[in-house]
Every structure is written in structure tokens, then in C-alpha cells.
UniProtKB/Swiss-Prot annotation:
Any single Gene Ontology cellular-component annotation: cytoplasm
A GO molecular-function descriptor: metal ion binding
Protein name: Tubulin beta-1 chain
Chain positions recorded as Mg(2+) binding sites: E69
Ranges where the record places region Disordered: 428-448
Gene: TUB-1
Compositionally biased region (Acidic residues): 430-448
Amino acid sequence: MREIVHIQAGQCGNQIGSKFWEVISDEHGVDPTGSYHGDSDLQLERINVYYSEASGGKYVPRCVLVDLEPGTMDSVRAGPFGQLFRPDNFVFGQSGAGNNWAKGHYTEGAELVESVLDVIRKECESCDCLQGFQMCHSLGGGTGSGMGTLLISKMREEFPDRIMNTFSVMPSPKVSDTVVEPYNATLSIHQLVENTDETFCIDNEALYDICFRTLKLTNPTYGDLNHLVSATMSGVTTCLRFPGQLNADLRKLAVNMVPFPRLHFFMPGFAPLTSRGSQQYRVLTVAELTQQMFDAKNMMAACDPRHGRYLTVAAMFRGRMSMKEVDDQMLNAQNKNSSYFVEWIPNNVKTAVCDIPPRGLKMSVTFMGNTTAIQEIFKRVSEQFTVMFRRKAFLHWYTGEGMDEMEFTEAESNMNDLVSEYQQYQEAGIGDDEEEDEEGVMGEEIDA
């Protein structure tokens, strides 16, 4: 069946990734030793999307763990599901990337990349019909961003026709872990624009907001944030793993979501978000789910969808529900907010429904929006980048690893192009072929 090979790179990627494996192992009834203790045949029907079966009926994740320092790997191995992974699939260096994209992409990471590719090839060979890859990484650090993008471009060469899907943690506007985040992120986005099919932009700040406002957690930990991310990740692939009335896979998703090849940065969301204590006091309706799903408070990227327009949207519903009601509510949402959808893509909402809800909920929905508002993230990073790059601050760390200033300039202009592409489609109407016409039309209106 349609397998997905999961790769997690760097500290952030490994922490989110291991949380994700806890969530889907729970959904499939796989315990920390890899044995199945489920209660339904549905859990096993398509378990081989993410797991391969080893001798003795053990299920082993199709997962490759990569880092340039051993620390995070050790904590994954010592964590609750650490014994689940194939020991050979931990590939790590000793030196660390030190939050330096150039180390991850050109020096330290480049030395390790062949051994990682070997492990990835092994995983792919055990697949029956590989659908694609998903990678978890952050764009602010050194390994996930530098080495992560290096791996993506190498895998693109080797598996050109497979889907490349990334869950990328963007630098946050207020919460910064590293001073050189804007550099690392810009260099990474420069790569992602060219080499991935779908990128889910996740943002720590948006996750913090969800934890504070909606989940009412007074001091959220990274564990809480990662829990939100893994809920989204599990939702995106539900349709592959469980039977449903309307199935979607990564390729269908890409075909429906990406109107222009460069604009494949999605804003994920999840509903219902209820605080852990208050779950049992509510019963959810499809209408409430749909309303919550389009709410800016539920978005996992720190940009406001009301500042842009949706090019396309996909919604993955989970749980037993009436298809008619889902269709009605989705239509209703589009009609009510029609000004937030571009009118030159009719029916730009794709819906999928899967019968199995996540643990602890009767029904839920995972939201993916390809909105022009995502340019806010890129604009923010770009501004920070420009301020530092103008003074050539911190550049010696990168040029010392053999990078050229030209590469920074290219990455910067590529990102600015991306922003203006989003802006252009945000303003485009049905009748305009060119932007000049648009200004002309505006002018006529004023005369009239």
C-alpha cells in the first residue's frame, strides 16, 4: 500500500517527530515495544503506510532520525517510544551545526548526508509502492534547516516523481531562539520553494497563542506545542491510514491545493481545540467544527487569514458524520466568507472524510489553507534578514564555511519574489489578465 517514509532532522524535528509517532502509534494500537494491542481491524488495515512489519509481528516505523549532535537522539531513545525505532535508523554526527545553516548544508551535514541517504534507500526498498516523504524540521536552526534542505534536494534527485511534504517550523515574530534565525530561514525557504510539493508552515508563536487563549494553559511547554503539531500531522494523513467515505492522499492533496508550483506553503489548523479539562462537557456539531476551523485563532501559523484570500483550502474531517451536513456546512462557510476566497478558482475547497476520530474526540477536522496571508511570515523574516544583511552582521560564520554572499542575495530576492507573487494573486480578479488592466479598471471606476 501507499507508504510514506518519515524523516526528522535536527532538535526540533526530532522532538515533534517523536511526539507524532506517539500519537499515531496510539491510533493504530501499537505499544512502545512495537506489538499490536488494538481493538479494531481498521487499525491494522493500512498500518503499513507508516510501519513495516518485522519478524515476530512487531511494527517498526518507517522513520529516519537525523541530527548533527547525539543529544536529542539520546533523549528520543530514552523516551516512551524510543525502543520502537530501528536502531540503524538513528544517523547522527558528533559536532553539531551550531545554529549555522552553512554547517548543516555544506560542511558537517554534507559529510553525513550519504549515510542518511543509504538509510532512506533501505526504507524505500522495503516499500511496496512508495507514495512520498514527509520531513519534520525547523527553519531557524542549523541542522533541520541546513541539512534538512540538503536532504530534500538530494532526495529530489533520486526520487523525482515522489511527493515531498514538509512540516516546517517557522521562526516566530516575538519568540526567537537564535539571533541568526532570519538568515537560516531565508536560505531554507529559498530551497523549499524549489524542492518541495507541500510545506506546512507551523509557528511557535501561533502555537503559544493557542495554548494560552484557547487551551487555557498558564505556562505551556514545548511538549504542549508539539502535541498540537502532531495532532495536525496525524490529521493530514488520516485518509491514507484509515478507510473513509472520501479519501485523499498526499498527491491528491497537492493537485488540489497548489495552483502555481511555487505557492505551496500551507497554513494548518485544527478543530476542536478545547482545554484538556473541558472536553467532556461539550458535544460538537459539524457546524461548530467548520466555524472553528476557519477561525484565525485556530491557525498554527502566526498570520491572519483575514489579511489575505484563500487560493485553495482542504479540510479533513474525522469521525462519524453525515456527508450531506459536511457539504452543506462547507458551502455555507464559503458563501458567508466569499470575499476571502479568490473568485477565479471556483469550488476551491477540497473535503475528505475519514470514519475514525482521534483518541478522546467524537469528531475533529484538520484544516489546510493555501492563503495569500502566508506572505506575512515571509515578509517578517525578510525584513529581519535585510536589516542584518545590510550591515553584513554574522556573515563571517557562513562565509567561513565556504558560502558566498551572492547566495544570500539570491535567497533574499527569491523570497521577495515569493511575497510579490502571493500579493499579485491576492489582488487578481476574474477579468484581469495583467496587472496593468487592473489599474486601468480601477481608473475607470474612479472617472465614473
